[in-house]
Amino acid sequence: MIEADRLIQPNIIERDEIEAVDRAMRPKMLDEYTGQDDTRAQLKIFIQAAQKRGEALDHMLIYGPPGLGKTTLAMIVANEMGVNIKSTSGPVLEKAGDLAALLTNLEPNDVLFIDEIHRLSPVVEEILYPAMEDYQLDIMIGEGPAARSIKLDLPPFTLVGATTRAGALTSPLRARFGIPLRLEFYNVKDLSSIVTRSAKVMDLAIDDEGAIEIARRSRGTPRIANRLLRRVRDFAEVKHRGEVTKIIAEEALDMLDVDAEGFDYMDRKLLLAIIDKFMGGPVGLDNLAAAIGEERETIEDVLEPFLIQQGFIQRTPRGRIATPRAYSHFNIIQPVS
């Protein structure tokens, strides 16, 4: 299992991330949202069109690696539409009654946000189909031969589902989302803007180079950038006069064992396992998981995406392969095949 205090783990939310300062860091409207330009442009059109027609926005599926702002986007959609948002997650909705209670309390055009929607149970998913398509809720009354089905009308609403594993959704559920949106890793420029904005909310002095250095080591992920910013702030307040510069950011992040590529101990452990234990690969996912003592799902969902996107690992039909860039990162000469 990945350590709970892994600084760059994007799917762990720190306790202080739900406090007021973190809520203030989140953009409230699309104009405040940084990055994901294509997604933002599409959403503006869809929201304005729905508002002109006086209708609920079409159901929306937001997918991509953890920490890229899926929850934030759902809240922005509700704010832009001027409606309420009710939030839950797939594992929490164990029974059909859990979902029915949420649906029957929605006001017209409200947003229902379901995180980890790929983890919905089949019985809950079945209830969701008519609710999404016809705004109706099918409920069974009674048991056995006396059981009967009744239909309850629901107000028009927008379901926003979020997932890191879009492929794990069943085809019938995936087909019912009219607006699929994929979030990509952020570039350094956009991330540095997010770091600068967050520092302002925290009343922290930071120069452009300091923000860029934190952004460079944040794995393209805003959640990680904000987490690293907090730790750099601690370092700056204790070791220096509180202002974050490039040198201070470098010192702090080096001390935290986050290297220039944004890798920590687990990333390096995975790459070195492929290079040293499996001679650069290919290696199957199960063997790799056993070699580093990690679950295969964690490798697939948390560790691999950024390493693949940055060109350190290749995924082939025969398994994972370390690329020349991975060898170069550790100053290891790649053997000739």
From Swiss-Prot:
One Pfam annotation reads RuvB_N
Q: Which reactions appear under catalytic activity for this entry?
A: ATP + H2O = ADP + phosphate + H(+)
Q: Which GO terms describe its molecular function?
A: ATP binding; ATP hydrolysis activity; four-way junction DNA binding; four-way junction helicase activity
Cell compartment(s), UniProt: Cytoplasm
Q: Which UniProt keywords apply?
A: ATP-binding, Cytoplasm, DNA damage, DNA recombination, DNA repair, DNA-binding, Hydrolase, Nucleotide-binding
Top-level division of the source organism's lineage: Bacteria
Known function: The RuvA-RuvB-RuvC complex processes Holliday junction (HJ) DNA during genetic recombination and DNA repair, while the RuvA-RuvB complex plays an important role in the rescue of blocked DNA replication forks via replication fork reversal (RFR). RuvA specifically binds to HJ cruciform DNA, conferring on it an open structure. The RuvB hexamer acts as an ATP-dependent pump, pulling dsDNA into and through the RuvAB complex. RuvB forms 2 homohexamers on either side of HJ DNA bound by 1 or 2 RuvA tetramers; 4 subunits per hexamer contact DNA at a time.
Would you tell me the protein name for this molecule?
Holliday junction branch migration complex subunit RuvB
Originating species: Shewanella pealeana (strain ATCC 700345 / ANG-SQ1)
Q: What lineage does the source organism belong to?
A: Bacteria, Pseudomonadati, Pseudomonadota, Gammaproteobacteria, Alteromonadales
